[in-house]
Amino acid sequence: GLGLSVHGGFRVVTEGAVLAMPETGIGFFPDIGASYFLPRLPGAIGMYLGLTGHRLDAADALYTGLATHFVPRDGLEGVGDALADNPGDPVDVVLNRLAGRSPVAGSRLAEVRGDVDWAFGAPSLGEIEKRLRHLDTAWAADALATLESASPQSLEITHALLARGRQRTLRECLGAELALTRTTIRTPDFLEGVRAALVDKDRTPNWQRASLGGRTLPS
């Protein structure tokens, strides 16, 4: 997963890649060091991904920097041989030879980057909501609906973690996540989120607090 691969120097995706941190939808928060690497993505992309769990394809992964190289799926088996056959060549040069035409130009996230930065760069969850409503676009409506369906507790935890994560070391971020995990897994929202998503699979969690639309979150 991302928690391991993001720290590697070479992060390869294929045309079938899907990357996401969907934890707020099950009453949890992005962990495995996400509070360290998400705030270090360009602009407010990390906050957007952490709060909404938006799914990235290969083009988006390359655009955000979560992936460094693209190799077609049918070329993956040849990566090891190509590296072994060209021991004097830098790894990135070998990977680029295998890439063919990179899909990065097709990033859908790049198309809404300005709106992402403006809305999710807001200082509070309440302000993020206001800015999304102000935008009045299909992307903003989708993002707002996702937030309103997520656990309010998880959104608050995630926003706070990511806001502080930029100033923390990886060790500090992992420590904070571990401490929060020990308490969060005992909360009603986590149990309800797991029930709705993984056990009964009815996708209708009954969170303990009102939704984002109920305006109970910090403003």
Where are these predicted regions, by residue range?
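Hydrophobic/aromatic residues within transmembrane alpha-helices
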Residues: 4-5, 60-61, 158, 197
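Inter-helical turn/loop segments and adjacent helix faces that build the functional surface
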Residues: 48, 56, 70-73
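Amphipathic alpha-helical blocks and their helix-capping loop/short-beta junctions
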Residues: 66-150
